[in-house]
Amino acid sequence: MYRIRVFGDPVLRKRAKPVTKFDDNLEKTIERMIETMYHYDGVGLAAPQVGISQRFFVMDVGNGPVAVINPEILEIDPETEVAEEGCLSFPEIFVEIERSKRIKVRYQNTKGEYVEEVLEGYAARVFQHEFDHLNGVLIIDRISPAKRLLLRKKLMDIARTVKR
């Protein structure tokens, strides 16, 4: 199982590098990430959240775990909705975030094969959240400065726990 990196850890702010090697090592890492995600009752976990600055994440929105490698968002529906999101890198913080209701995506599976699909609702939301992590974008970047200010003390408390 991996240790979850929390707000304040520099790896969370980096743009992750593409995966180029599809091997047993990647599969083992993904299995371990799935185990970590389930242990912490998450529905998604991006590689940077476990200290790996590479472009992949795992998610499970009720249909079993999926590994998403080198993802791209091909189309974003202009229709959006606001819903509450949490993040394993922000313990006990939940914020309202506006996201597209429907997206068309392409990514690679663990064998390096391309998968293209349309995601809607909760699956689209989770994908967008995890995709943000690969670009160094965090949930607090998607809220107003006023709301961020209200969370300042909690954020500072979380950042103090980061092992330097």
UniProtKB/Swiss-Prot annotation:
Cofactor(s) of this protein: Fe(2+)
InterPro entries with a match to the protein in the record: Peptide_deformylase, Peptide_deformylase_sf
Disulfide bonds: none
Catalytic activity, EC: 3.5.1.88
EC supergroup of this enzyme: hydrolase
Active site: E130
Signal peptide: none
Cofactor note: Binds 1 Fe(2+) ion.
Pfam families associated with the record: Pep_deformylase (PF01327)
GO biological process: co-translational protein modification; translation
GO molecular function: metal ion binding; peptide deformylase activity
Catalyzed chemical reaction(s): N-terminal N-formyl-L-methionyl-[peptide] + H2O = N-terminal L-methionyl-[peptide] + formate
Keywords, comma-separated and alphabetical: Hydrolase, Iron, Metal-binding, Protein biosynthesis
Annotated binding of Fe cation, by residue: C87, H129, H133
Family: Belongs to the polypeptide deformylase family.
Function according to Swiss-Prot or TrEMBL: Removes the formyl group from the N-terminal Met of newly synthesized proteins. Requires at least a dipeptide for an efficient rate of reaction. N-terminal L-methionine is a prerequisite for activity but the enzyme has broad specificity at other positions.
Protein name: Peptide deformylase
Source organism phylogeny: Bacteria, Thermotogati, Thermotogota, Thermotogae, Thermotogales
Gene giving rise to this polypeptide: def
